[in-house]
Amino acid sequence: MRKDRNLRRRALIRLSLARNTRRLILSVAAFILATLFVLVACSAPQNESGQSNNQQPAARDWKPVEQALGKAGSVQPGDVYKVSLPRSDLKVTVGDVQVKALLALGSWVAFKKAGNMTMVMGDLVLTEDEVTAVLTKLQEGGVEQTALHNHVLHESPRIMYMHIHAMADAVKIAKAIHDALTLSKTPFAAPAAGNQTQDLGIDTKQLDQIMGQSGKVNGGVYQFSVPRAEKIMENDMEVPPSMGVAHAINFQPTGGGKAAITGDFVLISSEVNPVIRALRDNGIEVTALHSHMLFESPRLFFMHFWGNDDALKLARGIRAALDKTNSAKT
C-alpha cells in the first residue's frame, strides 16, 4: 500500500516537472521571437523623418491628387508628394544668359498628410500679366498666398514668384491649383526625359568637392539642395526640406568653364548679413531678400543671388556663404 502511494507521488512529481519545463521552454521561445521582431523592425531602412521605409507613403494612393492637378509627381523624403511644373514655355534672359527652366523658372507644389487634412505649399512662376487672374482663382479655391515677389534682377520678360499655402483636402486643393494655373500658360505635359549623365562642360566633381556634397544633373542644370540642421515648423507642423526650406543652389553652364548661378539661401535673422558679406566678397550679387511663409518657426528669410563667372570660383563663394549658416552636415 505504502509502495503504491510512493509510486503515485513520484509519477505526479515527474508530471509536474514536465509541465514546468514545457512552460519554461515556451516562455524562452516567446522571448526569442519578440527580440527578433524588435531587431528586424529597428534594422529596417529609414527615411529622413526616421520612419521605416516599409511604411513609406509610396504605398499611399496619390493618384487622385495627380488626376486633380493634371500632372504626376513623386514621393520625396519626409512623406512629401511633390509635383514639378517647370515653365518651359517661357523664354527668359538675364543679360546674355538664356535662363533654363530648371535654373530659375521651376514652379512646384508639395503635399504632406496631416491627419485627415493635407498641408500644401508651393512656388508658382508667373509673368506679370498672369499674376492677378491666378491669385484671384486661388483665393476662390481656398488657397492662400504667403508671398509675391521677384527672385532675380534684370530678367526679360519680368517674372514673379507666388508662394502658396493651404491646409485642406488634398484633391480639392490640387483641383483649385490646376484651375488657377490654366489661367496662365504653365505647361502640364511631362517634359522630355533628359540625360542625367550628360557632360555639362563644367567640372562637376570639383563642384561636389567644394560644396561638400553631390549635386545632380536636371534639365541641363547642376543642382544642390542643402537642408538646414534644425526643424522648421509651420503652424505646429514640421516642414520637411523638400517643401522649400532647404538652400537651393543651381549652376547653368554658360561656356568656357563658366556658369550662371542662382537659387536661394534659407536663413535665420542672425545669418542674413554674414551671408550677404560672404556673397559680395566673392563677386556674387544679392538679388532679393524676403519671406516665403507667414507662420514659420524659426522665422526665416530667403536670400536669392546671381552670378555668371568661373563655376569653381562661384562655388567657393557659395561655400563661404553656406559656412555662415546652420546647415546640416554631409
At which residue positions do the language-model features occur?
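C-terminal motif of bacterial Sec signal peptides marking the signal peptidase cleavage site
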Residues: 40-41
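N-terminal secretory signal peptides that target proteins for export/translocation
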Residues: 1-22
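Long, contiguous binding/interaction regions
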Residues: 46-80, 84-131, 136-140, 144-158, ...
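Intrinsically disordered, low-complexity segments enriched in glycine/proline and serine/threonine
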Residues: 6-9, 25, 49-54
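Terminal low-complexity, intrinsically disordered regions
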Residues: 2, 34, 44-48
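Sec-dependent signal peptide hydrophobic core
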Residues: 25-33
